[in-house]
Amino acid sequence: MRFCSHGNFFALPNEIFLLGLTAGELAVYSFLRRCEDRKTRQCWPSIKTIGQAVRMSENTVRKYIRQLEERGLITAEPTEVITKTGEKRNGNLLFTLRPIREVIDEHYASQLAELELATERQRVAKLLRERESPA
């Protein structure tokens, strides 16, 4: 099994732990981070290769890739290859890892919006209670 490699270590941003990722999401993200081209932020390991590296089935890897996409950490685009006989075949997915700062900023903006909505709901509920109760 051949893994992507950039030496004996890779950097994983500390902020990744602020997002509440599951162990599976973190494992898949870490492997993609290990494989990525630092300039383009892209990599294209196969689902099978990812699964072997993180010791998960291919279906489980697909599930975590989908969840990482939903969280906005990565994008996964299908690719095509042309065989020697001229046939078009599906290639590996092309993964693009988004800059962690953008992901964190979006995460905090989402949390703030949820908090503001909850605060507004509480305010409206209080107003309704005050109107309904006799003075």
Please describe what each predicted stretch is.
Residues 1-135:
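Electropositive, intrinsically flexible nucleic-acid-contacting patches
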